[in-house]
């Protein structure tokens, strides 16, 4: 993957049509509790893919499995054409959690730098990349601030920059904007779409917010109640930007709500 600030998508047209994550009969239990059952679908390289469903439908568990944090009990999945057990590119999978998880004893710059601590990049290369992503999310003037000195929206930008600094091929997001007010959440939606256009990375995000899924995603997987199964995958064939005042978007939102 090239520079995060590249003006051209990093994937060729052919690669953008291929599957970057493929799931086959994926299931997960916690003791006697079935959380996920027979998950079968594929996520295309370069797309924004949303997962919606009721609480307890296994959405976050699913993200934890494809991030490598949790192992499935049965079934399998492939990343970039390789079985998960043989995949060696986990450092290019970024995970943005619901909580920003900023370290209070680190400045904005040092929180972003945390993502590069276990890499072989030289000091100057690290500094250049950190400065680049801080500029990219519009926080240059706040680079030396402490987390308690910045707003919730800014904290989300720091968390996003920390994810981007590793130049991920896939960005996983678990309700990252759910704690923000409506205006700030809308701003972060625009920020995510802008960065997606710049980098061409694949984005997979979980949300309870049907409007958020409709505004951001190319496709939406609807998970059933526990055990989580894929009820349907819905294509969102709407041009961007998608405004909530648009009648076509409103109809898409109504359609998704009916499917949950």
Name each region found by the language model.
Residues 82-97, 118, 123-127, 243-247:
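ABC ATPase NBD coupling module
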Residues 124-142, 194:
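Conserved ABC ATPase "signature" region
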């Amino acid at each position: 993957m090239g520079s995060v600030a590249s003006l051209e998508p990093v994937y060729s047209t052919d690669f953008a049509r291929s599957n970057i994550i493929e799931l086959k009969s994926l299931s997960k239990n916690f003791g006697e509790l079935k959380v996920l059952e027979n998950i079968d679908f594929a996520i295309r390289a370069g797309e924004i893919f949303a997962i919606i469903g009721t609480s307890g439908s296994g959405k976050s568990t699913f993200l934890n499995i494809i991030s490598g944090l949790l192992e499935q009990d049965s079934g399998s999945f492939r990343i970039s054409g390789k079985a998960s057990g043989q995949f060696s590119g986990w450092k290019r999978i970024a995970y943005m959690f619901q909580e920003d998880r900023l370290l209070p004893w680190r400045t904005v710059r040092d929180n972003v730098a945390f993502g590069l601590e276990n890499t072989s990049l030289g000091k100057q290369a690290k500094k250049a990349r950190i400065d680049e992503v801080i500029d990219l999310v519009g926080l240059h003037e706040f680079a030396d601030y402490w987390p308690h000195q910045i707003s919730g929206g800014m904290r989300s930008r720091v968390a996003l920059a920390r994810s981007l600094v590793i130049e991920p091929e896939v960005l996983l997001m678990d309700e990252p904007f759910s704690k923000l007010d409506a205006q700030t959440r809308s701003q972060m939606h625009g920020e995510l779409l802008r960065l997606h256009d710049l980098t061409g990375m694949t984005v997979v995000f979980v949300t309870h917010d049907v409007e958020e899924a409709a505004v951001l995603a190319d496709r939406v997987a609807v998970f059933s109640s526990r055990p989580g199964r894929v009820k349907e995958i819905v294509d969102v064939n709407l041009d961007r930007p998608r405004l909530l005042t648009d009648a076509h978007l409103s109809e898409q939102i109504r359609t998704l709500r009916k499917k949950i």
